[in-house]
Structures are given as structure tokens and as C-alpha cells.
């Protein structure tokens, strides 16, 4: 990274560097940030924005931007802050990385930081009449300020931008989300095909979709806010309550981040068990995705078939973890208990049964003339768009984007197994559907290799020795893994509090589904309103993972 640091120093002489951590940290003043960001993307190839993390450092408010060069897989992070707590403002980078649009709105919602030149400076999760910004350290949580309201939000069509002219003057410009002549319909929040409480305000021209405004936050539970008053062990529980079809993966990611901060070496057997549980959960998730997508298109029979195989996986979870979905199995240093003696045999049996039924899934639906007509060529997301909107996982790979974290930044024991990264190139609903079925074959391939490794595993150490009271040193860490729907990222910051029951200073989850809904408008535009449901189903988002 030394050459990158030199180039950044040339581009921005005011930049400060810290290379002592895992990733190069670049601190820049806000007035230089946009120019540097443009150079980082266009000259240095940092074309992928992993996360925008808002942080209140008490003496300042700001963001940590995590960036990746998708060609070299180099990563760095940039810190930009302001000391103005009354009217905190930073310059937007949503014109450079489209994913920053929703992420900066989230930062504004929770920290009150306005982004100059952002096209739509509305809150994202909380009501428009919410008082205060909950993740600020000076937030007043008095329930009288924000009572439970049973009325609709006022002025939901109003938004604004802070526009900066060539002289640096910033003017607030009031705007409307939809024009007066647009015909807008509501899809959700209580609609079966939104797969939860999510709302699409949709502008249509005849049968064609012209614009989709995503309205989320109906089940926002404030997981990141609650984490500020929990110990690290207690935070593990809430990590499973986001994407319930990737519960083990989310918990695995948080454990890895804490273990990285403490320098804990996890026993080989424990990592092997973790990886097997991850892949079993990936299989279960892709089976559910198949069932839901077929149901959304009226194929009721096909919907029920994958539930038969999912029961095999849930039986394994229940027998070895004591629960079927939110297993609370990973812990800091390993797993909470060893697997049962017949675990490997059960996994092998499940792999054999699921593999035998994959051709049946294709026979039921993949060649159906109605399915082909509704999915082929609809909801197209190009590779460039996938990178720009930071859409990874199966959706990104269906657009030709090589983005599997298990390959690009191997964690756990993925560098010890042989598997293929499944990549398609059309980027339409059909490729997204087909890719998940193909990925199931690779998960089975990984699981069989893991079973062979378990047979040869010596000893039964399933957890490292860790302190009873977890205390992290002062610093910040970022960890990502490949979850069912894309990369889940965990940002963790500690202030080094010496108190016995130390709590995270800042814990942020960069959920894959939050990025997926960022392309709903893009993929649905100029498609038939009837196909909107199919397109969004092929994105395979989970509402609690969006809302957190």
C-alpha cells in the first residue's frame, strides 16, 4: 500500500496517514474529500464503496468510508469529519458511487450530518417528524419527544438538496419526490410479495414503471443503538435478528471482528464447524429463495418442494445447536458446544438428498414458458451498475461481477477447500434465479470436503480460551464475509473503556439487503408493473436485514 499512499499524498497534500492498522487509514478535510474521492475512483481504481459508517467522536461528527479496488482487491478507508455539531455537513460522494445515496441518507437519519449536493436529503428509516438523531452521543431518548404515533407521516413527498455553487455558497433547494403529473401507486407495506413490511411508491405510465421510491423502516428496531448498552457477548444475539436466513453468518462475522481485535486464534475444528454451518444456512436460504420466487409468479406447487429439503437442514441445526433458525451457536473464540457424533453423517445425507432434487426444481419451473417470459431480459443489472451500487452476492455475480468474499478475501477455512465462483453475465431475473440453484451445487461440494476434513480432525477443541470479560483495546476494525445475499460487513470501534463490562463505542452492520433495495428503481424502470414483483423477488432481500 506504500505506492498508493504516495499517490494519495500527491493528490491531496493535506491528507494524513495511519498505516499501523489492518488497512491504510487516510484522514482528509471535507473540502478536499470530493476531489480525492474522484481521484481514488478514476485514477487509483477504487471503484467499490463497501460502507459509509457514521460515527460521533464527541469532538467531531463524521464518516468512515471503506473502499475496494475490484481489480487488485486492495482496500483502504478514509475518515472525513466536521467539528460543527450544530449544522454538521460533509460533501456527498453519491455522484461517484451510487450506493452512497442510501448510505448517506442513513447517516443523516441517525447522526444529522447533511451531505452537500446529495439529490435527496430525506431520512431513510425514521419518520420525517422524528425529533433528534439517535446514534449521536448527545441524543435525548426521552419518550415524550417521540411518542408512538398512529397517524401517517406528514409531507412524505417533500425532500431537499443542499446545492453548492462555484463560489462555495450552499443553498437549500426544496424538491418533490414525484411530479404533480405523475401517477403514483402504493405497493405495500402490507403486500404479500414485498416479503415483509416494505413499501414501494411507484410511478407508472400505463403498464410501465417509471420510478420507484423505496420507503423502509417499518420494523427498524435500533439494533446499532441498543448495542451501545450491551456487552460484546450480548451483541451476538442481536446480530442474528437481521437476516434470519443468514443468522449464523451474521454472528460469524461479528465474532471474527471481535477475534481480530483481540488477536484470538480460533481452533481449526471450530472454524471448520462454523464454515459447515454457514454453507448449510446458504443452502437453506437459496432453497427458500427458489420457493418464494416461484410462488410470486403463481407456481404454488414449486413453492412447497424446497421446504421438504430445508427440514433436513433444520433438523441438523436443531440437533447440534438447539434451535432451527437463530441458533446462537457461534461464540467469541469458536462455537458454544461440539457437534453431535452423527453430525457428519447427517450432513452427508442432506447433501445427497438436496443434490438429487436440484434437477427436479429445474423440471418444475426453470423451463416454464411463463417463467421464461417474465424473467428473461427483465430487471437487467449490468456489471458496471452492480459495482457502482455495491451489489455483491448472487445478484452481483449474475451480472458478471466476481465478488465472492470467500474468494477475494478468504476467511475461516475457505482457502483450504476447492469450489468454483459461479458467475453469469446477463444480469436479468432469470440469471439471478439460475445462479442460486447453481451455487447450491458448490455449497454441497464445500460441505463434502468439510466432512472429509472432519473425519481426519484430531482432538475436539471447539473454542479457544477467552477472557470472561471481553475488553477491546482502543481502535476500530472492519470485517466482511460472504452471507447468503451478499457481503455482510461489521464495523466495530472501541474507546478502550477500562470498566469491567465494556460496551462497543460504535457497532455498525453493513447489510447486503440494504444495497439490494438501492437498485430496485434502477432494475424496475421501464419494465411492466406486473414484473416488478418478479424482479424484486429475484433480488432476494430480507426486510429485517434492511431495517435492522
Model-derived features: positions:
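Terminal low-complexity/charged segments
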Residues: 1-208, 285, 367-378, 443, ...
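Active-site bordering "gate/hinge" segments
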Residues: 128, 161-195, 203-548
Amino acid at each position: 500500500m506504500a505506492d498508493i499512499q504516495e499517490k494519495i499524498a500527491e493528490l491531496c497534500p493535506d491528507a494524513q496517514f495511519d498505516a499501523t492498522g489492518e488497512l491504510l487509514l487516510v484522514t482528509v478535510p471535507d473540502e478536499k474529500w470530493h476531489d480525492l474521492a474522484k481521484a481514488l475512483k478514476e485514477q487509483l481504481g477504487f471503484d467499490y464503496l463497501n460502507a459509509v459508517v457514521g460515527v460521533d467522536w464527541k469532538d467531531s461528527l463524521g464518516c468512515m468510508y471503506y473502499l475496494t479496488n475490484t481489480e487488485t482487491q486492495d482496500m483502504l478507508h478514509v475518515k472525513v469529519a466536521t467539528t460543527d455539531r450544530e449544522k454538521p455537513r460533509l460533501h456527498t460522494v453519491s455522484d461517484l458511487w451510487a450506493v452512497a445515496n442510501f448510505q448517506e441518507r442513513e447517516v443523516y437519519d441517525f447522526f444529522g450530518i447533511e451531505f452537500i449536493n446529495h439529490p435527496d436529503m430525506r431520512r431513510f428509516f425514521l419518520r420525517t417528524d422524528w425529533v433528534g438523531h439517535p446514534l449521536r452521543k448527545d441524543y435525548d431518548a426521552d419518550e415524550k419527544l417521540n411518542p408512538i404515533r398512529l397517524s401517517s407521516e406528514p409531507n412524505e413527498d417533500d425532500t431537499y438538496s443542499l446545492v453548492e455553487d462555484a463560489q462555495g455558497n450552499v443553498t437549500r433547494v426544496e424538491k418533490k419526490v414525484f411530479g404533480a403529473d405523475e401517477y403514483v401507486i402504493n405497493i405495500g407495506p402490507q403486500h404479500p410479495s414485498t416479503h415483509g413490511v416494505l413499501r414501494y411508491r411507484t410511478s407508472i405510465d400505463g403498464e410501465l414503471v417509471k420510478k420507484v421510491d423505496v420507503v423502509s423502516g417499518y420494523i427498524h428496531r435500533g439494533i446499532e443503538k441498543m448495542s451501545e448498552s450491551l456487552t460484546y457477548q450480548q451483541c451476538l444475539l442481536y446480530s442474528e435478528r437481521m437476516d434470519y436466513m443468514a443468522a449464523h453468518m451474521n454472528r460469524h462475522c461479528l465474532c471474527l471482528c471481535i477475534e481480530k481485535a483481540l488477536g484470538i486464534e480460533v481452533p481449526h475444528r471450530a472454524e471448520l464447524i462454523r464454515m459447515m454451518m454457514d454453507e448449510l444456512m446458504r443452502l437453506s436460504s437459496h432453497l427458500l429463495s427458489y420457493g418464494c420466487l416461484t410462488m410470486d409468479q403463481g407456481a404454488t406447487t414449486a413453492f412447497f418442494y424446497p421446504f421438504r429439503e430445508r427440514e433436513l437442514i433444520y433438523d441438523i441445526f436443531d440437533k447440534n445447536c438447539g434451535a432451527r433458525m437463530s441458533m446462537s451457536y457461534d461464540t467469541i473464540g469458536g462455537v458454544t458446544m461440539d457437534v453431535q457424533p452423527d453430525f457428519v453423517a447427517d450432513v452427508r445425507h442432506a447433501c445427497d438428498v438436496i443434490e438429487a432434487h436440484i434437477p427436479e426444481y429445474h423440471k418444475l419451473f426453470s423451463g416454464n414458458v411463463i417463467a421464461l417470459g417474465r424473467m428473461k431480459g427483465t430487471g437487467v443489472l449490468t456489471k458496471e451498475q452492480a459495482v457502482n451500487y455495491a451489489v455483491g452476492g448472487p445478484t452481483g455475480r449474475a451480472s458478471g461481477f466476481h465478488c465472492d468474499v470467500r474468494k477475494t478475501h478468504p476467511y475461516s477455512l475457505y482457502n483450504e477447500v476447492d469450489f468454483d465462483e459461479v458467475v453469469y453475465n446477463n444480469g436479468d431475473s432469470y440469471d439471478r434465479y439460475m445462479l442460486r440453484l447453481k451455487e447450491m451445487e458448490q455449497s454441497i461440494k464445500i460441505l463434502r470436503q468439510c466432512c472429509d476434513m472432519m473425519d481426519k480432525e484430531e482432538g475436539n477443541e471447539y473454542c479457544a480460551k477467552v477472557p470472561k470479560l471481553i475488553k477491546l483495546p482502543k481502535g476500530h476494525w472492519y470485517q466482511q464475509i460472504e452471507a447468503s445475499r451478499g457481503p455482510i460487513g461489521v464495523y466495530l470501534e472501541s474507546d478502550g473503556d477500562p470498566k469491567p463490562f465494556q460496551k462497543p463505542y460504535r457497532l455498525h452492520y453493513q447489510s447486503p439487503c440494504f444495497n439490494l433495495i438501492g437498485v430496485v428503481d434502477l432494475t424496475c424502470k421501464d419494465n411492466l408493473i406486473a414484473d416488478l414483483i418478479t424482479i424484486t423477488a429475484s433480488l432476494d432481500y430480507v426486510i429485517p436485514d434492511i431495517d435492522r
